[in-house]
Amino acid sequence: MFSKVLVANRGEIAVRVMRACEELGVRTVAVYSEADKHGGHVRYADEAYNIGPARAADSYLDHESVIEAARKADADAIHPGYGFLAENAEFARKVEDSEFTWVGPSADAMERLGEKTKARSLMQDADVPVVPGTTEPADSAEDVKAVADDYGYPVAIKAEGGGGGRGLKVVHSEDEVDGQFETAKREGEAYFDNASVYVEKYLEAPRHIEVQILADEHGNVRHLGERDCSLQRRHQKVIEEAPSPALSEDLRERIGEAARRGVRAAEYTNAGTVEFLVEDGEFYFMEVNTRIQVEHTVTEEVTGLDVVKWQLRVAAGEELDFSQDDVEIEGHSMEFRINAEAPEKEFAPATGTLSTYDPPGGIGIRMDDAVRQGDEIGGDYDSMIAKLIVTGSDREEVLVRAERALNEFDIEGLRTVIPFHRLMLTDEAFREGSHTTKYLDEVLDPERIEAAVERWSPEAVAGDEEEGEVTERTFTVEVNGKRFEVSLEERGAPAIPLGGASAAASASKPSGPRKRREESDEGGQQVIEGDGESVAAEMQGTILAVEVDEGDDVEPGDTVCILEAMKMENDVVAERGGTVSQVLVGEGDSVDMGDVLLVLE
């Protein structure tokens, strides 16, 4: 076993890997950006190294900085976690060619499976069903139209290196092809350094089923059952569970064995996930995630196997010490991603300070996180701040236990998806397990989400009170040895967050022109004002593209900018028509919430 492992990641997954290392007697090394110098993974590690500024491309994605940190720390292995460099075959090869051990599949296997067209061909050869489409990259929009001619609309354009919905664009008609083709290529280049895309028939109402795989360097391949990840918004998983409530025993066995065949054909080792779409009793290969998954936790809960420990053991050359028949699924488990997002605003990323952070406990409750009360949640990285994993003897017990746990979970200082999760636990389709990947985006009434937020959001989210609203403050007092909670209401008072934080200023939206301060050439600040209507950023992020120029006429609903926040593209649209009089941002600019992007006359 290794003596010291560098974890090339941040947040909860970095801490998860470090905990596994600690139980194996392995020392840990963290890397961090300027934005994460007080991060939970830095606090947990035995030692830590700064690898650059907040921008991921200059820190967590910088190959040489990560490897140099491993050299400074005298580590003997590098674990990538998930995201960032976890599925980057070029980085894996650099690690393999260095003095370090790569905790993951070989670079060759990653290349075979990381490029989706190669993976589709390989799976077809292994007698694993695939969705109809191309087995070569699409060179032009005409290739997309050709697939649509063969199979009909809608079709999906997917980035070769994509995953998690990034670089995936659904085309419903021919007039959408050109724009979506370019967007998919741009996202592929931005997120995965690979602008190649492929095309396949888009299934209308599938389940998203994935199989956890472990394979060692001695020829042993095991599957640990399936997970159901069908509850998604914008192709991003929200709640995952194991086992799936939608599979028959026959289909479950067929999918598991297909996953083993495909992985064996790819000469794959270490942990991985084979993802499938299931519709009308048939299953189709989608992709292989050549890394640990966010939702590996539910598999651990129902199998009793520590997937991360096995990653480390396999990388150290150990042999899997259990057979396929030894793998037994017991009970049921669900994972609730606790994202800093505003569900009522189409899950827009949120930022703020965790003025209160008090997670639940009790039997069947597991928390994977790397935050504590008082931490600042910025917009530089993914919006997930924690994972709540709830396990019970069956799905019904998990649903009841999850209601209790989410009711217990106390977070204040920023928006989270907890009200949405509580809504899902009352939702008939989810409780029955009949939902598909389209349920949130196409079926669920948005007004129900708004009502859930009104019902279950904290009463004092910092900066969210409008002037004149009633603010409730709760005090604990003791009278004759007995404790009482006393609530006082005051109209127009600012909310006072718990945890010693200072009162936040009102975030009410001003009317009329807004201002944006920019650095002038002389280094001072200049104030840019417009008499027209300002189009402002609703969140912190980076400008990926500006779709208009000064002098352009726009209509209500037209996209004027594309803003990336927490790894998601967000269209900034004009609320009314007009002529663009000023464009105040350019591609690559970082903006804060409220910054004016352009002015319409």
From Swiss-Prot:
Which residues are in the Biotinyl-binding domain? 526-601
Where Mn(2+) 2 binds, per the record, is at: 287, 289
Location of the Biotin carboxylation domain: 1-445
**How is its cofactor bound, per UniProt?**
Binds 2 magnesium or manganese ions per subunit.
Give residues annotated as binding ATP: 148-209
User: Which positions are annotated as binding biotin?
Assistant: 347
Which SMART domains would you find in this protein's record? Answer: Biotin_carb_C (SM00878)
All copies of the ATP-grasp domain together span: 120-316
Residues annotated with N6-biotinyllysine modification = 567
A Pfam match is Biotin_carb_C
What superkingdom does the record give?
Archaea
The record's Gene3D superfamilies line, in alphabetical order, gives: 2.40.50.100, 3.40.50.20, ATP-grasp fold, A domain (3.30.1490.20), ATP-grasp fold, B domain (3.30.470.20)
Q: Matching InterPro entries, A to Z?
A: ATP-grasp (IPR011761), ATP_grasp_subdomain_1 (IPR013815), BC-like_N (IPR005481), Biotin_BS (IPR001882), Biotin_carboxylase_complex (IPR050856), Biotin_carboxylation_dom (IPR011764), Biotin_COase_C (IPR005482), Biotin_lipoyl (IPR000089)
Extract the GO molecular function terms from the UniProt entry. ATP binding; biotin carboxylase activity; metal ion binding; propionyl-CoA carboxylase activity
State its cofactor.
Mg(2+); Mn(2+); biotin
Summarize where Mg(2+) 1 binds, as residue positions. 275, 287
Keywords for the protein's UniProt record, in alphabetical order: ATP-binding, Biotin, Ligase, Magnesium, Manganese, Metal-binding, Nucleotide-binding
Task: Give me the reactions it catalyses.
Answer: propanoyl-CoA + hydrogencarbonate + ATP = (S)-methylmalonyl-CoA + ADP + phosphate + H(+); N(6)-biotinyl-L-lysyl-[protein] + hydrogencarbonate + ATP = N(6)-carboxybiotinyl-L-lysyl-[protein] + ADP + phosphate + H(+)
| Function, as annotated | This is one of the subunits of the biotin-dependent propionyl-CoA carboxylase (PCC), the enzyme catalyzing the carboxylation of propionyl-CoA/propanoyl-CoA to D-methylmalonyl-CoA/(S)-methylmalonyl-CoA. Within the holoenzyme, the alpha subunit catalyzes the ATP-dependent carboxylation of the biotin carried by the biotin carboxyl carrier (BCC) domain, while the beta subunit then transfers the carboxyl group from carboxylated biotin to propionyl-CoA.
Free-text domain note: Consists of an N-terminal biotin carboxylation/carboxylase (BC) domain that catalyzes the transient carboxylation of the biotin covalently attached to the C-terminal biotinyl-binding/biotin carboxyl carrier (BCC) domain.
The record's note on quaternary structure and interaction partners says: The propionyl coenzyme A carboxylase (PCC) complex is composed of three subunits: PccA (biotin carboxylase and biotin-carboxyl carrier), PccB (carboxyltransferase) and PccX.
The identity of this protein, by name, is Propionyl-CoA carboxylase, biotin carboxylase and biotin-carboxyl carrier subunit
